[in-house]
């Protein structure tokens, strides 16, 4: 078994909506990013890549490459997952924590879990997503951006 950890953060800027966990969420602000700014899928992709010792999302999909400008993070996750499976790994489970004062994430979490399970070809019971605030402390608490942490457990499927 191998464990990976991922973290991502994006500042608010411009106009919304935002995309979090593959879900389009109405919000007056957008997120500043080279791709679609999906902190959940970026952190999750990093956690999975880390567990497989395949580097990180920036190595695989560099923000200096125009090909990834505005990229759909679900596509990036699926490509990373293909590479991980090619190394002989299967998914144990993933656990994601969104850190944001606003917008409210709870109504969108069930759909995030559906999308992640679809993209990883796993059961929804293998995907947990939760959200918290920082009680108005720090940059997320001041509403300056959104952060996310993710943990992934991989199991060696083949020798």
UniProtKB/Swiss-Prot annotation:
Query: Which family does the record assign?
Result: Belongs to the IspF family.
Q: For this protein, what is the EC number?
A: 4.6.1.12
Keyword Glycoprotein annotated: no
Keyword flag Metal-binding: yes
Residues annotated as binding a divalent metal cation are: 8, 10, 42
Query: Which purpose does this protein serve, as stated in its record?
Result: Involved in the biosynthesis of isopentenyl diphosphate (IPP) and dimethylallyl diphosphate (DMAPP), two major building blocks of isoprenoid compounds. Catalyzes the conversion of 4-diphosphocytidyl-2-C-methyl-D-erythritol 2-phosphate (CDP-ME2P) to 2-C-methyl-D-erythritol 2,4-cyclodiphosphate (ME-CPP) with a corresponding release of cytidine 5-monophosphate (CMP).
Q: Where is this site: Transition state stabilizer?
A: 34, 133
Q: Can you tell which superkingdom this protein's organism belongs to?
A: Bacteria
Q: What class of enzyme is it?
A: lyase
Q: Which UniProt keywords apply?
A: Isoprene biosynthesis, Lyase, Metal-binding
Pfam families tied to this protein: YgbB (PF02542)
Q: What PROSITE patterns does the record tag this protein with? A: ISPF
Cofactor note (record): Binds 1 divalent metal cation per subunit.
Biological processes, Gene Ontology terms:
isopentenyl diphosphate biosynthetic process, methylerythritol 4-phosphate pathway; terpenoid biosynthetic process
Give the pathway annotation.
Answer: Isoprenoid biosynthesis; isopentenyl diphosphate biosynthesis via DXP pathway; isopentenyl diphosphate from 1-deoxy-D-xylulose 5-phosphate: step 4/6
Chain residues that bind 4-CDP-2-C-methyl-D-erythritol 2-phosphate: 8-10, 34-35, 56-58, 61-65, 100-106, 132-135, 139, 142
Q: Which cofactor does it need?
A: a divalent metal cation
Q: Name one GO molecular function term.
A: metal ion binding
What Gene3D superfamilies does the annotation carry? 2-C-methyl-D-erythritol 2,4-cyclodiphosphate synthase
From the broadest rank down, the organism's phylogenetic lineage runs: Bacteria, Pseudomonadati, Pseudomonadota, Gammaproteobacteria, Enterobacterales
**Catalysed reactions listed for this entry:** 4-CDP-2-C-methyl-D-erythritol 2-phosphate = 2-C-methyl-D-erythritol 2,4-cyclic diphosphate + CMP
According to the record's subunit comment, the protein's assembly and interactions are:
Homotrimer.
This one is known as 2-C-methyl-D-erythritol 2,4-cyclodiphosphate synthase
